[in-house]
Amino acid sequence: VRFRAPVAVALAATLLTGCAQSVDPIERLGKKAAQRVRPHGPAPEQPYRHWGLTAPLAPAPKPSPGPPARSAGPGLPPVVDHIRTRDRVVFLTYDHEASARRDPNFTDMVRELRLPVTEFGTAQGRRPVAGLPYDAQRTEICGHLARPRPRLLRPPDGTYDTTTRRAAADCGISALVLWRASTTTGTLTYARGAHRLTPGDIVRITPTDTTVRLLRGIQERGLTVGRLEDYL
């Protein structure tokens, strides 16, 4: 079993936090010179159209998390599949087996649409740690976490027990992240609650080629994509 940090797959954190925009050569010519310059060729296609969306994704609001997730016991990290918030956002998460970072189309889409997604780097072929003794679980979790240590953990297959939470807490984990909705069958399925996307839902996406279809559904519900780390 190998655990790695959840990473914001915006192909560098600058895409999530904002970076200095490039200066177009026409801007450097000055206003009068720029008026004499006419761009050549057709206008570039808007990224959202290139990826099959009819409108750009709405920008995520300034995060306003609700009450913190409740822990099942003192010192134990909470297990979350939904964030309590009034913000109309959902959270897109990917496991390692989705090959999100190995799919060039996926990484291009994330970069061009500036999607704040989270990948949990749990290695393929891993077995659940639930049921193992404390020392074994702690070794698996602490021993294989990437540096710097992550705050969030997705246990293999989403299975865990109280020992998993104790071991995770001792490894510096602040929350175990599951999902309320998933696309593992190619369509959205729900672990509990309403059979529709609702604000605060955490979505597990695999395979990655279902992302665009999901984004259309998110827009139809009047939602957008938020950054999970801003709410946990």
Map each language-model feature to its residues.
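Active-site beta->alpha N-cap acidic-glycine motif
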Residues: 49-136, 232
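Bacterial signal peptide processing site
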Residues: 20-22
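His/Asp/Glu-enriched short active-site or ligand-binding loop at hydrolase and phosphoryl-transfer sites
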Residues: 159-196, 223-232
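Acidic (Asp/Glu)-rich catalytic clusters
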Residues: 106-113, 123-124, 130, 168-170, ...
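N-terminal export and membrane-targeting signals
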Residues: 1-11
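CE4/NodB-like, metal-dependent polysaccharide N-deacetylase domain
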Residues: 109-116, 134-161, 195-204
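C-terminal motif of bacterial Sec signal peptides marking the signal peptidase cleavage site
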Residues: 15-18
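Post-signal peptide N-terminal segment of mature Sec-exported envelope proteins
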Residues: 29-55
